[in-house]
Structure formats: C-alpha cells, structure tokens
Design a protein with these regions (language model features):
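Glycine-rich phosphate-binding P-loop
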Residues: 11-30
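A short acidic, often aromatic-flanked loop/helix-cap motif at beta-alpha or helix-coil junctions
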Residues: 45-48, 111-117
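Hydrophobic/aromatic beta-strand patches that form the interior of the parallel beta-sheet core
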Residues: 11, 73-75, 106-108
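Extreme N-terminal, non-catalytic leader segments
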Residues: 1-12
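Post-Walker A helix-loop "phosphate-sensing" segment adjacent to the P-loop in P-loop NTPases
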Residues: 30-38
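C-terminal accessory "lid"/substrate-recognition subdomains
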Residues: 2, 106, 113, 120-151
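ATP-dependent NMP and nucleoside kinases share a basic, alpha-helical "lid"
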Residues: 42-101
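Conserved beta-strand segments of alpha/beta enzyme cores
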Residues: 38, 104-106
Length: 151
C-alpha cells in the first residue's frame, strides 16, 4: 500500500468514455474535500489521447505528460468485460502513454462503493468499513435476551 496522500495534492482519474472515471472522480472529490485534495478527470493527457484517437496526432503528448508529472497519483479506471473496441483502444493508449513516460498509476476496478473503496486504498486511504451489526441474541429455551444460556 502506498503512503497516505498528502493534503493539497492533485489526483487524476483517467479512463475511457463510459468507464465511470467521471463518477469516481466526483465521489473522490467529495470524500477528499476536507484534505484539500484536487481530483481531476479532465486532464491535458486525456485530451492528448482523444486527439490521437481522432486525428492520429500525438503533438500534445509531451506537454500533457509534463503537466501530468505534477499529479501526486493517477488512477486509471479499468474496463468492464463488455467494453467496445474504442474503449479498449483509449485504455491501451492511456496505459502506453503513462508507462512510456514512467508515470506510475493504479488500475481501479469494481462498481459503485467497491470502486470508491479500491480507489481510496490505492491512494493510501482505507475506506471505512461498514459498521457490523451483531444479531440480537434470541434464546430458544426461554426467550430472554440476557439469560445465562447466552454464555
């Protein structure tokens, strides 16, 4: 596990269209607001990848990657099993750009609360566990919840 994210950091959340990156970024921004952490899902790197996909133009990559180096952490939202070819290509280009520039990233999988918990763990912030409810004791001999049969 990585060290806890320092206050004032910037986290980028990247992913193909429809991957849930924007939804995760919003949830993280709310969760990390008290730490004064900025969460971005609309980054120069994502724009550079989009331009490469549409026009085959990689001219924005160097500047985008240099800007991205200032981010404390990059979370890449993993694709689900039913991703289309365009999403797979976007994901592959994002991974290649980050890896090629030597920028570390964590791939985040899951849905909803599970995805948020996985992202928090990747940032070195454990998601609080849901409170456990202990089933009330119900004695089948006397129906008294505090009887000696409980022992």
């Amino acid at each position: 596990m990585r060290q806890a994210l320092p206050a004032g950091s910037t986290v980028s959340v990247l992913g193909a269209d429809g991957s849930g990156a924007s939804t995760l970024a919003r949830a993280l921004a709310i969760r990390l607001q008290a730490r004064h952490v900025t969460v971005l899902d609309d980054t120069p790197l994502r724009h550079a990848i989009d331009r490469e996909l549409r026009l085959g133009d990689r001219s924005l990559h160097d500047d985008a990657l240099n800007a991205h180096r200032r981010h404390a952490c990059t979370l890449l939202v993993g694709l689900d099993a039913h991703a289309d070819a365009q999403c797979e290509r976007t994901d592959a280009l994002l991974r290649a750009a980050l890896a090629g520039a030597g920028l570390p990233f964590a791939v985040i999988h899951g849905q909803g609360g599970e995805r948020l918990a996985n992202a928090l763990r990747a940032l070195g912030l454990e998601a609080p566990e849901a409170p456990r409810r202990i089933a009330p004791f119900d004695c089948d001999k006397c129906s008294d919840p505090v009887c000696e049969h409980r022992l």
